[in-house]
């Protein structure tokens, strides 16, 4: 599910047997899309530009900044056994916005509330900051990765496959 036709085209090229929906995530009904089938894994990568330290001085759009709330909709309706979310490390500072700017004194409050609500839906949650290059990706950027499970199985993090050059 993505609103961007270029993103859909790229994904369709790499995953031709996957069903693709070009739509806003807010307009897609998880129950309808899943057609009663169980969901093993749901992956979420909400827009990071409103959290990233590289964003500059642009004003914050609450609708985009709040995209991670869609995770709770899926968790509460389609109930994926495993949920993964990746974003920039600053995602953990998600908090209230006033006059188009994050309220620094309340940094992280929305993130904590969001995690509490996901936990209340029966998910065990763990998150880490990982460097993608340690796992073979051609970037040294640090990424926030969250894994949530509701199937009673442990969360197991992969071992690093690549090491930094000394």
Positions of predicted regions on the chain:
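Class I S-adenosyl-L-methionine
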Residues: 28-41, 48-166
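Active-site flanking residues adjacent to catalytic metal/cofactor-binding acidic residues
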Residues: 1, 23, 44, 85-86
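SAM cofactor-binding core of SAM-dependent methyltransferases
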Residues: 1-27
